[in-house]
């Protein structure tokens, strides 16, 4: 069975689920200690180490409203000391418990760290007329959802790059936040992070408290730039955001393509991705490269559309 994809250039490479998850856990948690990696793998919930045909039912513990259309959902793993073990830039597939319609299956990115014990968390936006997101927003504590995976979109390796630039919009922050958490929780990973995050108003900024804590705790390595296209009167002063969209000039001055050994990850609505990195391809294909990043001198090999 095929359950995981990992990037090889702009084309996906299919890996058997056991190899993919084991490799992903090793990549993320590599701290020079084989025993530490083995200990983590041994605690990883076995439901996230099986084939794609293996679906596991997890009960909802709680949910928290983050904005008018977005919630953080916390699901319980079977045992209190279980961990997800899911590597950065990976996601799970979810479907309503007891149903098998392919149209009801959706990918969701965990925002909890791989070593978080007992639970796994997701930030999910309610899409109008979206079957799965509507189902998620109808859940009550102790209701269950079926999950399978993980699917690895990009195989992250610690210290492969001196720095990464993250361009996100709206709920596209979730895989970028996942990557930030993975880097910053790994004492061996010294990668610097430059995040450009665009929204309409301050109320739409997801995980702002957590992002600001990253910047405060790792001020020498993390720089965050907020942009609001339709700010309210107090938004700019309260958030320190800039009015408008992520400016080409800001990327050029704060994250120039001339920086050696750097990489860019882009995630957001289709028009956002197209404007900055070119049209995204179907499924796991990267599609054409273009947009503002190409104009700034970045090459296709330096940019990944999450």
From Swiss-Prot:
Compartments in which it is found: Mitochondrion outer membrane
Sample GO molecular function, one term: cytochrome-b5 reductase activity, acting on NAD(P)H
Catalytic activity: 2 Fe(III)-[cytochrome b5] + NADH = 2 Fe(II)-[cytochrome b5] + NAD(+) + H(+)
Single GO cellular component term: mitochondrial outer membrane
Keywords: FAD, Flavoprotein, Membrane, Mitochondrion, Mitochondrion outer membrane, NAD, Oxidoreductase, Transmembrane, Transmembrane helix
InterPro entries: CBR-like, Cbr1-like_FAD-bd_dom, FAD-bd_FR_type, Flavoprot_Pyr_Nucl_cyt_Rdtase, FNR_nucleotide-bd, OxRdtase_FAD/NAD-bd, Riboflavin_synthase-like_b-brl
Cofactor needs: FAD
Pfam families: FAD_binding_6, NAD_binding_1
Domain FAD-binding FR-type: 53-157
Annotated residues for binding of FAD: 160-195
GO biological process: ergosterol biosynthetic process
Superkingdom of source: Eukaryota
Similarity remark: Belongs to the flavoprotein pyridine nucleotide cytochrome reductase family.
Name of the protein in its database record: NADH-cytochrome b5 reductase 2-B
